[in-house]
Swiss-Prot record:
Topological relation to the membrane, as annotated: Multi-pass membrane protein
Protein name: NADH-quinone oxidoreductase subunit H
Enzyme class: translocase
Membrane-spanning residues: 31-51, 102-122, 132-152, 171-191, 205-225, 263-283, 286-306, 322-342
Binding partners and assembly: NDH-1 is composed of 14 different subunits. Subunits NuoA, H, J, K, L, M, N constitute the membrane sector of the complex.
Superkingdom classification of source: Bacteria
Reported function: NDH-1 shuttles electrons from NADH, via FMN and iron-sulfur (Fe-S) centers, to quinones in the respiratory chain. The immediate electron acceptor for the enzyme in this species is believed to be ubiquinone. Couples the redox reaction to proton translocation (for every two electrons transferred, four hydrogen ions are translocated across the cytoplasmic membrane), and thus conserves the redox energy in a proton gradient. This subunit may bind ubiquinone.
Keyword field contains Cell wall biogenesis/degradation: no
Ranges in coiled-coil conformation: none
Length: 350
């Protein structure tokens, strides 16, 4: 029942619309819009919970209480902060480049929402199952570099510009290890379709076949999405808030929401590419596939939070050296070893 709940609801709705003699195009568009609304609801609710969970986890690591005033155990603190940001005035400084300045917050939030449209959340639960899903993810995430540069440059602030320059250097440096780690998974699965990659892990998860690729991807994605120890783009002790320094009110809230949405996307991609996606471990199929997906996602999120609250921020030169002098060569070596291993495997099978 739980396994087919959402899929059954979608099929039932499609059957009902067709019985009402709706044009097939109208039916498809309506169901796609419904899927987008569902993705947005999932995104907002998880982002609200993630902010609270991150604060509570950090408090536990540092032996303090964390949010504890608004609601039982502070569970409504994130809601209160959201209302506060909604109520704040959106102040636009005089010397900003107005249109790029206003467009950047909208685009920075749109990018992760677009990524959610190709994620296989469960068996048969993919809003849009692209044949080139991996390529789509790489292409869309690359746009974030341009958006952060827009925000920093248009703000006409030295701290914002410095943060934007750091973001470009950081994201370009760690883009190659991310792509190469994803390529090793594509080689194993023989497909760029995310649902095919999940299906290829039905017997063995790729974390066991690609342990080096997993570590590379885990580290590089953390750097791509600017989480500690790679949070140099908005290092509070150095450049205030980086590209977000001149933003206030709802504009700042969009940047903040995009940060946690990207955080969620990183955990989702680790789950999809290396932890079997919605596949159940130990044959425990009595738990719905979408619930397994969420459990794995939050396990990876907890690992990322652990690194955030236990590691120190590194310097920009250390971060770039680590990407170009260590991660990239190891990523290339992993690709060659994967290719050679697949060649030997096929030779033995012959």
């Amino acid at each position: 029942m739980g396994e087919n709940l959402f899929v059954g609801m979608a099929k039932g709705l499609r059957t009902w619309l067709e019985s009402q003699h709706f044009v097939p195009l109208v039916t498809d568009v309506f169901l796609m819009l419904l899927a987008v609304v569902g993705v947005l609801a999932f995104l907002f609710l998880n982002a609200l919970f993630l902010i609270y969970y991150d604060r509570k986890f950090g408090a536990w690591v540092q032996a303090r209480l964390g949010p504890n005033r608004v609601g039982p155990r502070g569970i409504f603190q994130t809601v209160a902060d959201t209302v506060k940001l909604f109520a704040k005035e959106i102040f636009i400084p005089n010397n900003v480049d107005r249109w790029p300045y206003l467009l950047a917050p909208v685009l920075i939030f749109t990018i992760p929402v677009m990524l959610f449209l190709v994620i296989p959340f469960g068996k048969g639960m993919v809003p849009y199952d692209l044949n080139l899903g991996v390529l789509y993810l790489v292409a869309i995430t690359s746009v974030e570099t341009i958006v952060l540069w827009m925000a920093g440059w248009s703000s006409n602030n030295k701290y914002s510009l410095l943060g934007a320059m750091r973001s470009v250097a950081q994201m370009l440096s760690y883009e190659m290890p991310v792509i190469l780690a994803m390529l090793s998974v594509v080689m194993m699965a023989g497909s760029m379709k995310l649902s095919d990659i999940v299906a290829a892990q039905q017997k063995v998860w790729f974390i066991f076949l690609q342990p080096v690729g997993f570590l590379i991807y885990f580290i590089a994605v953390n750097a791509e999405f600017k989480r500690t120890p790679f949070d140099l783009v908005e290092g509070e002790s150095e450049i205030i808030s980086g590209p977000y320094t001149e933003y206030s009110g709802m504009n700042f809230a969009l940047f903040f929401l995009a940060e946690y949405t990207n955080f969620m996307i990183g955990a989702i991609m680790v789950t999809t590419l290396f932890l079997g996606g919605w596949n159940a471990p130990f044959g425990w199929t009595f738990i719905p596939s979408w619930l397994w997906f969420i459990i794995k996602m939050y396990f990876v999120i907890t690992l990322y939070m652990w690194t955030r609250w236990t590691f120190l921020r590194i310097r920009i030169d250390q971060m770039l050296n680590f990407a170009w002098k260590f991660l990239l060569p190891v990523s290339l070596a992993n690709i060659f070893i994967t290719g050679f291993g697949l060649y030997l495997y096929r030779m033995i099978r012959w």
